[in-house]
Amino acid sequence: MTKSIQAIRGMSDTLPEEIPYWSFLENACRSVVSAYHYREIRFPVVEQTALFKRTIGEATDIVEKEMYTFTDRNGDSLTLRPEGTAGCVRAGIQNGLFYNQIQRLWYLGPMFRHERPQKGRYRQFYQLGVETYGMAGAPIEAELIFMCLRLWKALGLESCIHLELNTLGTLDSRNAYRQALVTYLQSREKELDEDSRRRLHTNPLRILDSKNPDLQPLLAEAPKLIDYLDETSRRHFDQLRSLLDQAEVPFIVNPTLVRGLDYYTHTVFEWVTDQLGAQGTVCAGGRYDNLVELLGGKSTPAAGFAAGLERLVLLLRGVQECLDKIDIYVVIAGEAVIQEGLLMTEQLRNVLPEWVIEADLSGSSLKSQFKRADKSGAKWALVIGEEEIKTNTVTLKHLRETVPQKSLTRDTLIPYLKSEG
């Protein structure tokens, strides 16, 4: 027997019963971002490897260990995008979107990272990305956070996701803090785990994000970034917190919060849940004013966020009822009337265009069809058999309430269904 081919590890299929949750989520994303007049942008899933090395940082885990990189037939090094911001900035520069313009953009699509797969973390994963360009200051950051909260409310998830904030300050203040942190950690290097020792010489801020419980006492005594902020950075962060307080958006200031990408400055934030174990971050973002210039564009203030759709779907499944709604399941009694049943079902769709109607064209027994009708979650079963064809009637059975079934003429069926909703 030929061995079957399996999906690549960490790249899963999305099956039909899961799609309604994805559709609900994607539609909510589009609705919320459009309400703020953000415009969609699309860019390739494959970019030059140099793009990510320059923006994400050579010493990050993403570039060192997680990127899907290959050499094409021309000898060029290409990479499947591990995140969307770098590609969005590249597209903006190449197409002149940032030249003396304010841009509010969004995108939705797959990203790729070679990580160890587990619940909520995959090698192909989908993100909603929201990016703003040309606006400095805290107000646009507050708008991004308001947008996130509005999305959680639209999804019914606001009670299980909370906001954490921090500031990385300007590059100058962050560099001063980085030196103080390195000096402190070097004095206690023997207490660091292997991964943190490596990061000490490459990306020391990431040590603050360690989940190793043995390191937490050491990190609690580490220098605090807030003590190294310049006055500009302090005012920026104070203004953001004031705006959130005025809008009654609850938040926690988390001084150990850093992002895994080198290009962040000033504000960083994460929306976190305690319902997904170790993969608790469902959305993350902040400000990255130096990124456009880093890629060869004109100095442009920028801020944005990315939300992980797989993790949001996991949360949705816990709070939303089945989203695969069927209004009518048409039971066709006997192979002799399948054609009549099919044509009548199509007529129903013409007059009830908003209703979801499924016709059983299997020709199987009534018992089997009613089992499928009940399992489908449909509200009504509409029975069409030889007797109904002869008398120009249908039999209507309510599948969710214990009420007598009804025999209706075709003329009275539509008004009755509309009245019952």
From Swiss-Prot:
Entry EC number(s): 6.1.1.21
Superkingdom of source: Bacteria
Keyword Ribonucleoprotein on entry: no
InterPro entries: aa-tRNA-synth_II, aa-tRNA-synth_II/BPL/LPL, Anticodon-bd, Anticodon-bd_dom_sf, His-tRNA-ligase, HisRS-like_core, HisRS/HisZ, HisRS_anticodon
CDD domains cross-referenced by the UniProt entry: HisRS-like_core, HisRS_anticodon
A GO CC annotation given for this chain: cytoplasm
Localization per Swiss-Prot or TrEMBL: Cytoplasm
GO biological process terms on file: histidyl-tRNA aminoacylation
Keyword Manganese among UniProt keywords: no
Broad class of enzyme this protein falls into: ligase
GO terms assigned for molecular function: ATP binding; histidine-tRNA ligase activity
Catalyzed reaction equations: tRNA(His) + L-histidine + ATP = L-histidyl-tRNA(His) + AMP + diphosphate + H(+)
SUPFAM superfamilies, alphabetized: Class II aaRS ABD-related, Class II aaRS and biotin synthetases
Key words, A-Z: Aminoacyl-tRNA synthetase, ATP-binding, Cytoplasm, Ligase, Nucleotide-binding, Protein biosynthesis
Family: Belongs to the class-II aminoacyl-tRNA synthetase family.
HAMAP family for the chain: His_tRNA_synth
Quaternary assembly: Homodimer.
Record protein name field: Histidine--tRNA ligase
